[in-house]
């Protein structure tokens, strides 16, 4: 497990988070990539942040969990960058993504957030 992964997210919960990202991509607003995700967290506009566990070097996303904690934003870990990229509508992987406006996935994001807070 990478240094920056603070807790294990069950596979079904990670899948739910990826589904919510897909729905938010189509009906709301998402930010893709580490830089855009970092800005969304700093501005406090992110509702849910997804970070891949297979990022190398780890330093690329190492700051995200701490920053999200400071801002009170829920963060979920998923296995691969490719999963995040695909859910965000990219043809390549993405180390991180943020849901800004969940759109039709609003209740899903609320459920995911509650479940992740229980894990911590």
Curated annotation (Swiss-Prot):
Key words of the record: Cytoplasm, Ribonucleoprotein, Ribosomal protein, RNA-binding, rRNA-binding, tRNA processing
SUPFAM superfamilies xref list: L30e-like
InterPro entries xref list: Ribosomal_eL30-like_sf, Ribosomal_eL8/eL30/eS12/Gad45, Ribosomal_eL8/Nhp2, Ribosomal_eL8_arc
Record's subcellular location: Cytoplasm
GO terms for biological process, alphabetical: translation; tRNA 5'-leader removal
Broad class of where this protein is predominantly found: cytoplasm
GO MF term list: ribonuclease P activity; rRNA binding; structural constituent of ribosome
Signal peptide extent: none
GO CC list: cytoplasm; ribonucleoprotein complex; ribosome
Binding partners and assembly: Part of the 50S ribosomal subunit. Probably part of the RNase P complex.
Family the UniProt entry places it in: Belongs to the eukaryotic ribosomal protein eL8 family.
Protein name per UniProt: Large ribosomal subunit protein eL8
High-level lineage: Archaea, Methanobacteriati, Methanobacteriota, Stenosarchaea group, Halobacteria
């Amino acid at each position: 497990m990478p240094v920056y992964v603070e807790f294990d997210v069950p596979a079904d919960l990670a899948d739910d988070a990826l589904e919510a990202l897909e729905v938010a991509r189509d009906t709301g607003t998402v930010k893709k990539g580490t830089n855009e995700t970092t800005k969304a967290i700093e501005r406090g506009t992110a509702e849910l942040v997804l970070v891949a566990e297979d990022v190398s070097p780890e330093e690329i996303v190492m700051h995200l969990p701490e920053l999200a904690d400071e801002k009170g934003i829920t963060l979920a870990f998923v296995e691969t960058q490719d999963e995040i990229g695909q859910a965000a509508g990219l043809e390549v992987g993405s180390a991180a993504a943020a849901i800004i406006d969940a759109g039709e996935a609003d209740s899903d994001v609320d459920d995911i957030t509650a479940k992740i807070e229980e894990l911590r």
